[in-house]
């Protein structure tokens, strides 16, 4: 496994950062819920130390050999260092400098997926829709295949959270920007046409007596 230079480059990060990432996960949750006091201050300090350790391991691994698939892959695991209250233009400029997301070779890895999840973690759940809009607006400027794959990934995530109103909004706003892939287009159409409270699409059926019936002309109300 460790024979190739790129595998060694990846392992240099994973081996050193695995424990630190585990600690960070625990400390983040602790800092969220623990009341003010000396212990909270100590936990925040420890969290900062562990995050710095991960970033150091990451930078060291990337610099082993710049330009390789491994280094490009690892670059999307860097911490997203900006204040979410900054203007959209500033955030987009930061992303274009640090996370270009234009490398098709990374599309079948989890690099871009990891970036999107990390981006969302900077926001409260109530702001996820706006955060995803920022990501999609950024991606829309680049490669359509990458945009479509990540749009599909975002839809899957919002579907798993049962955020159906957000799915409708995203489908309306970005559905025309995705590729002509049949499955994605069909999925987008289902979110816009069949959302809760929307009027059902009209269609014609044949009864067992051979009579054609149009849904909109049936006597019973429908939604």
Language-model features: locations:
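Oxidative protein folding and maturation machinery
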Residues: 1-208
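Short active-site neighborhood of thiol/selenol oxidoreductases, capturing the structured segment around
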Residues: 211-223
């Amino acid at each position: 496994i460790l024979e190739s230079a790129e595998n060694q480059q990846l392992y240099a990060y994973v081996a050193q950062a695995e424990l630190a990432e585990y600690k960070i996960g625990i400390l983040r949750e602790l800092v969220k819920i623990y009341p003010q006091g000396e212990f909270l201050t100590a936990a925040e300090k420890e969290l900062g130390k562990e995050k710095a350790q991960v970033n150091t391991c990451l930078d060291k691994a990337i610099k082993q050999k710049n330009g390789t698939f491994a280094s490009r892959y690892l670059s999307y695991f860097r911490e997203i260092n900006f204040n979410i209250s900054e203007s959209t233009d500033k955030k987009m400029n930061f992303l274009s400098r640090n996370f270009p997301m234009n490398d098709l070779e990374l599309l079948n890895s989890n690099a871009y997926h990891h970036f999107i999840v990390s981006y969302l973690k900077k926001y409260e759940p109530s702001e996820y829709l706006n955060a995803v809009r920022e990501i999609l607006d950024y991606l829309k400027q680049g490669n359509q295949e990458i945009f479509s794959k990540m749009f599909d990934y975002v839809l899957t995530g919002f579907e798993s959270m049962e955020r159906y109103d957000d799915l409708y909004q995203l489908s309306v706003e970005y559905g025309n920007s995705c590729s002509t892939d049949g499955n994605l287009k069909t999925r987008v159409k289902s979110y816009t046409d069949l959302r809760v409270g929307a009027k059902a699409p009209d269609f014609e059926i044949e009864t067992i007596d051979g009579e054609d019936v149009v849904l909109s002309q049936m006597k019973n109300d429908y939604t």
